[in-house]
Amino acid sequence: MKMEVIFKTDLRSSSQVVFHAGSLYNWFSVEIINSGRIVTTAIKTLLSTVKYDIVKSARIYAGQGYTEHQAQEEWNMILHVLFEEETESSASSESIHEKNDNETNECTSSFETLFEQEPPSEVPKDSKLYMLAQKTVQHIEQYGKAPDFNKVIRAHNFIQTIHGTPLKEEEKEVVRIMVIKLLKKK
């Protein structure tokens, strides 16, 4: 059964996971009955039938023209995000909602100052965060070059979707600096 995307930080808290393999056209879903390792096993089983070239062909079909290398990187990131918390215990849904509210407020205050400060001269060599910064710039440009409050929040939500987990404070700062530098090059 097709549904809208459900892509939570803790996938095991959902009764059904819908996996969106980086594409507008290819959907894979699996029903989850219990929490914990059963969900991880179900997702692994689901992913074993999906190849990264589906991501590549879907991106090309969507007119985005990803190279095979970019598709492989994105695919690896999807796998990493899905399984990086495998050994951690699940939190109750109530504490997850509470945590998400706090993270949203932190994100808001962090990204409100996106264009107010000058970045330092050095950019850390973190390819994952750099990719997030590039995608953020693309997202901001889609809505116009002078982002208002809502556009900045949309950009951060876009980052969270790709990253799969909320950014740490130091990661937000690194991405903010990269975004500023990338926008200045335009």
Swiss-Prot record:
Modifies the subcellular distribution of heterogeneous nuclear ribonucleoprotein K (HNRNPK) and may contribute to modulate HNRNPK functions related to processing and export of mRNAs during ASFV infection. Necessary for virus internalization. Belongs to the asfivirus phosphoprotein p30 family. Transmembrane segments: none annotated. GO terms for cellular component: host cell cytoplasm; host cell nucleus; virion component. Oligomer. Interacts with host HNRNPK. It is found in: Host cytoplasm; Host nucleus; Virion. It comes from the Viruses. This is Phosphoprotein p30. It comes from African swine fever virus (isolate Warthog/Namibia/Wart80/1980) (ASFV). Keywords: Early protein, Host cytoplasm, Host nucleus, Host-virus interaction, Phosphoprotein, Virion. Induction: Expressed in the early phase of the viral replicative cycle.
